[in-house]
Amino acid sequence: MALRKNTLAVQNDSELLSYIINQNPILSENIDLPVQGESIKPIGQIIINNERYRNAFINTVNLIGLTIIKRNGWDNPWDFTVRGTLSFGQQIRELILDLCNVYDYNKELKEDEAGFIKSVVPNVFNYIHEVNFQKFYKTSTSDAQLAMAFEREGNLFRFIEEAISMLYESLKYDRFIVDKYMLCRRILDGTVTPTQIANYDTLTPRQRVSALKAVSNKFTFRNPNYNPAGIRKATSFDDQILIVNTEFEADFSTDVLATSYFRDEADMRARLALIDSFSQHDNDRLQKLLLDAYIPFTEDEIEELEKIPAVLISREWFMDYYYLLDNAGETKELSFYNPQTLRNNHFLHAWMVFSTSPFEQATVYTPTAGTVTAVSVSPQSSTVSAGGQVQLTAKVTTTGFVNKAVKWSVTKGSEGGATVDQNGLVKIPSGFTPASSAVQITATSIYDNTKTGTASITVA
């Protein structure tokens, strides 16, 4: 579930204080409700001067703080990325079945009459998503701030904002920038299928929207070309999300988008998500959030990302989940009073899974065509003893957004038993005795099989 966005139907501090008192039995049993039009300062003094009442007040503020954000609140346009909650364990296993194998009746009858008793394993694909975000946010409030909350109109709202609301606002913002980072990294890695909009600069707004709509229509048919796993997947219109940058959206009137792409304005509001920019990121905060997992964007990558007008994804493409701390809620709020500093420390803990699906459909719209310019393998030459192994890596140089994956193969030395797996790990058997002691490994671009790189291995 996403963070709640509801706000309380209160108009002033008296109504807000009445709500807080009614929410806590300790307060409601011992303190009278404020009278509209009268100062709440006398009630504030009662609360401040009694430790039991003060603690009850702070605890209630912790519980309701999320629902009364009103000043610096921001609605995350990507609330759809949260899929649910994880109650137990640290992993979520995503399973999907591809189509069943098909057989020719006459051929099978002739070649394998007993085939009907054989078991056929379903074409099952799976991917594991793990809890990878364990953060907490902290702020402090003083007795002086609590006392000021009852001094004049508006101060009670301000106190709760300072104590609680910005904790949630910080988490909400961090969710957005991490999701945006994951999307852009997938695009740059080439695992989001590119769709070129030719002559983009000369097209009219309606023609540009028409180009977007053409791929949206294709999404509704089973197609293996829009996910890196090659699953024959279809996505209905209702489950498609179109992410557009603010400049792209500003070029179109509501009428153009609502009539040329979406069914109506209501459909547009449900399936259109804005992004401030594909190329601008809060790098300093991302570094603190992701630590070693953060890979800074290069200038060339930023230049390519800046060209993107829109991205189309399945609603289930993002795999974000809250981990239920103590199996109680999406987040955990805690506070304690420090008698030495006379301050309340407020904490918000959030554990999450931030991930994306390799099976759901996605495409990135781009005005330029992507190409593979070169494939290189490192190390280019090495010496390995019989029975040993060596790890090779491939670097695929590209322009635009294309799949950077490669297919590994043994192009010389396979007769001696040399093998290479899909990750580039080469193994030489202990009995390796080819006519020549040299082994050649080739990495072939998946996107453009005319581009290859090779490595030579000498078996000592």
Regions found by a protein language model. Give the residues of each.
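Assembly/oligomerization interface modules of large self-assembling protein complexes
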Residues: 54-139
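A short beta-strand micro-motif common to beta-rich folds, especially ectodomain repeats
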Residues: 434-449
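Long, contiguous amphipathic alpha-helices that act as assembly "spine/axial" helices in icosahedral shell
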Residues: 125-196, 346-348
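Extended, compositionally biased alpha-helical segments that mediate assembly or anchoring
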Residues: 2-62, 275-370
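Solvent-exposed, low-complexity, repeat-rich "mucin-like" stalks and linkers
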Residues: 374-404
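Low-complexity "stalk/linker" and mucin-like segments enriched in Ser/Thr/Pro/Ala/Gly
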Residues: 411-426
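Extended oligomerization regions of viral-like shell subunits
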Residues: 35, 211-326
